[in-house]
């Protein structure tokens, strides 16, 4: 079991449920816009949000955002240790730094002192795209071993100051490298791990890479908090993270939709129906399985196994509830009837 840290009261590691994070894509200086996005993330199921703090103006805005945020906030810091101190003093629940790029040991010590005083954990964020040149020369390119060595070098900097309230991430845009780094790290250390594939590309590729990388580790029992990185609205990252956790069997809240890929036997607009069901239930917290099937081959069987489901016919469909057929309706009446019954469950 990993060590546990507390981020604004949210436990990470130590056997706690895996925590979902995301990062805002607003300008941090846009206080109202940032708060609006934080609230959207919270409504989608995000538990911790991270913001970029690139300068002192952003640090001042970050402090204003912290006052009204419904979520614990992480300040993402690079290069200037004074920004980390300002963010910690402004209300950050966690500081994300790369100790190797904020200056000498005295500057790391200054950050550690304020985080110790305010009981703020630090995430060491190692990234394959910003490894130290020395490690690149040693390993040739950003290998898993290079990422892990960088993480331990940074951990040592904090431990020298007596600081152990730490979480670690080792991210790569290459799935096998990220997975190998996390597995190697876990054999050597019990600090909690923040896992994710970085810079994943367009949404379709990003979802596949994230599901493979994060999912592989979760099935190994590795990973205490996750962030799905997508070139898209951050809210979509949260929905994807929830789905990954549900697919890995680590979350039971929310709807699990079972639907067939359609074939020549389908006689209803199943694709349209499934998309409408998914949209209507995306914020439903009921831990239920909903089957939306296109024909009578597998449809009745899947619908019977689900909590509630539809099996399509020729322009009509049957609704099953707890294995029992309860209604046969025209296609246009299926969705409202299904949603009404789900509401009553």
Put a short name on every predicted segment:
Residues 56-77, 110-122, 184-193, 277-279:
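Alpha-helix-loop-beta-strand connector modules within alpha/beta enzyme cores
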Residues 127, 135-282:
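Catalytic alpha/beta core domains of metabolic enzymes, predominantly
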Residues 82-123:
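Hydrophobic or amphipathic alpha-helical targeting/insertion segments
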Residues 25, 30-31, 42-66, 96-104, ...:
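Glycine-rich, proline-tolerant flexible connector loops at the mouths of alpha/beta enzymes
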Residues 1-23, 116, 279:
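N-terminal amphipathic alpha-helix/helix-capping segment at the start of soluble metabolic enzymes
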Residues 18-24, 49-51, 73-77, 95-97, ...:
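Hydrophobic faces of well-ordered beta-strands that scaffold small-molecule active sites
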Residues 15-33, 52-54, 71-79, 135-148, ...:
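Active-site mouth loops of central-metabolism enzymes
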Residues 36, 41, 50-90:
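N-terminal active-site wall of soluble small-molecule enzyme domains
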């Amino acid at each position: 079991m990993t060590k546990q840290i507390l981020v604004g009261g949210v436990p990470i590691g130590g056997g706690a449920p895996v925590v979902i994070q995301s990062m805002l894509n607003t300008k941090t200086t846009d206080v109202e816009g940032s708060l609006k996005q934080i609230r959207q993330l919270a409504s989608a199921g995000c538990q911790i949000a991270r913001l970029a703090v690139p300068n002192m103006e952003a640090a001042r805005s970050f402090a204003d955002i912290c006052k009204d945020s419904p979520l614990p906030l992480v300040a993402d810091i690079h290069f200037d240790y004074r920004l980390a101190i300002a963010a910690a003093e402004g209300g950050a629940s966690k500081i994300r730094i790369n100790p190797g790029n904020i200056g000498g040991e005295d500057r790391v010590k200054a950050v550690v002192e304020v985080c110790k005083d305010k009981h703020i954990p630090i995430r060491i964020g190692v990234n394959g795209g910003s490894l130290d040149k020395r490690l690149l020369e040693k390993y040739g390119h950003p290998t898993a071993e290079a990422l892990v060595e960088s993480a331990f070098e940074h951990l040592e900097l904090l431990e020298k100051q007596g600081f152990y309230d730490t979480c670690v991430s080792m991210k790569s845009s290459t799935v096998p490298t990220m997975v190998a780094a996390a597995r190697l790290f876990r054999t050597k250390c019990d600090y909690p791990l923040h896992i994710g594939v970085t810079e994943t590309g367009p949404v379709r590729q990003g979802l596949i890479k994230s599901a493979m990388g994060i999912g592989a580790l979760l099935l190994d029992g590795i990973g205490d908090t996750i962030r799905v990185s997508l070139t898209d609205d951050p809210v979509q990252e949260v929905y994807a993270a929830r789905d990954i956790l549900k697919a890995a069997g680590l979350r039971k809240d929310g709807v699990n939709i079972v639907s067939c890929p359609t074939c020549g036997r389908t006689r209803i607009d199943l694709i349209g129906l499934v998309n409408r069901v998914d949209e209507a239930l995306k914020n439903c917290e009921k831990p239920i399985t909903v089957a939306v099937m296109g024909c009578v081959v597998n449809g009745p069987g899947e619908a019977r196994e689900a909590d509630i489901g539809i099996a399509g016919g020729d322009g009509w469909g049957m609704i099953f509830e707890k294995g029992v057929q309860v209604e046969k309706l025209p296609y246009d009446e299926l969705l409202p009837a299904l949603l009404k019954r789900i509401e009553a469950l």
